[in-house]
Amino acid sequence: MTLTRARVRISKDPEQALALITEAQNEAKQVMEELRQVAKGLHPRVLTDHGLASALPVAAERCPVPVRLQVLLPERPSKRAEGVAYYVVCEALTNVTKHARATRVDLVAEHLPQPEHGTEGLLQLTVTDDGCGGADPEVGTGLYGLWDRLDAVDGSLTVHSPPGKGTVLTAHIPWKA
């Protein structure tokens, strides 16, 4: 947007155009720094080094709403499954914080042996809050982003969110995604 304004002014007011280009450059630097911070948050070192069971408590602790966490994983799923799972949890906790007006969140990560999904089964994530409910997939991009991310690994997402009754988000990810 700023560069477009600069292009319009370049012939009429080169000094103003230069100021706009400098502004755009600063905005680009700021966006890159924000992207680095987001990327670090989406795939932190603890996830890479120690796995989902170690990374989930870190994500839960960062959430301003108190989180009760249960991790029932006998071993590490695939790295891809862990990355998708961590993203799903972070996005779900962000949605709770922004929209749910919840006082608590329950987060369960568990392995489900499901022969129909291969011998390894599924990684199931369940995020339950006691908030206001009424989550609408048609509003915002958060839930769409989750569906897209899960769809890319043949996973699934269900959201149960009756108005006034909180929200239950359940994600299934192939263990060896």
Annotate each predicted stretch with a short phrase:
Residues 1-177:
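Coiled-coil dimerization/phosphotransfer module
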